[in-house]
Design a protein with these regions (language model features):
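Membrane-interfacial alpha-helical segments at the cytosolic side of multi-pass membrane proteins
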Residues: 103-123
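Extracytosolic (periplasmic/ER-lumenal) interhelical loops and adjacent juxtamembrane/interface segments
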Residues: 17-96
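Interfacial helix-loop-helix junctions of multi-pass membrane proteins
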Residues: 16-23, 87-97, 164-183
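Membrane-interface loop-to-helix entry segments
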Residues: 95-110, 183
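Membrane-interfacial, low-structure loops and terminal tails that flank and connect transmembrane helices
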Residues: 123-149
Length: 183
């Protein structure tokens, strides 16, 4: 599912008419661009933490007016991402449905699912299933000392560290603004 959505995030702006998606700037966990009258299409001033003057950034956008597949793609992005144009890629003159950080999250999740699909086994517990991607010989000591849960939590935490550092540094320091290559 994540890989399919990731592909749709690239296909939607590529296959839509050029310049049909303007520069967006919404709020995470909110629907900002469903209709012409939605919050994101209003003018909220420049330089604020959320929103901008949409009329100065290409005009209004309503994903509900798109074909159903593109509407689903942009609608899911609208609900889950802030869609700030300066943090998003543009394809064919159209802003992508989610920011570069979310593209990285979907890519990492898709790669993890692929690795598990090729190497993992469905075992009795989540931690055993999670650790099944590693060769059994390298896991012998972990099982003998029953260190499965701490190892699983450590690996998961290690995977979240880059995202956490980037997100919290940006939140806590006004002088730091993450850029697309870092995301």
């Amino acid at each position: 599912v994540a890989a399919t959505y990731l592909v749709l995030c690239f296909l939607a702006p590529l296959l839509m008419p050029t310049d049909s998606v303007p520069e967006l700037s919404g709020r995470a966990n909110a629907i900002d661009y469903a209709f012409e009258s939605s919050w994101g299409n209003k003018d909220h001033g420049e330089g604020g933490k959320v929103g901008h003057d949409q009329s100065q950034h290409g005009g209004s956008f309503a994903w509900a007016e798109l074909n159903p597949l593109w509407a689903l793609t942009y609608g899911f992005g609208d609900l889950n991402c802030h869609q700030k144009h300066e943090r998003s890629w543009e394809i064919n003159g159209n802003q992508m449905p989610v920011c570069t950080r979310d593209i990285g999250i979907f890519l990492g999740f898709s790669i993890g699912c692929l690795i598990f699909g090729l190497r993992g086994f469905n075992r009795w517990t989540v931690r055993d299933t999670f650790l099944s991607v590693f060769p059994d010989d390298s896991m012998r000591r972990v099982y003998e000392k029953d260190m499965r849960l701490p190892l699983m939590l450590f690996i998961m935490g290690l995977g979240l560290v880059p995202m956490g550092i980037d997100g919290f540094t940006q939140l806590l320091l006004d002088s730091y603004e993450s850029n697309n290559p870092l995301r």
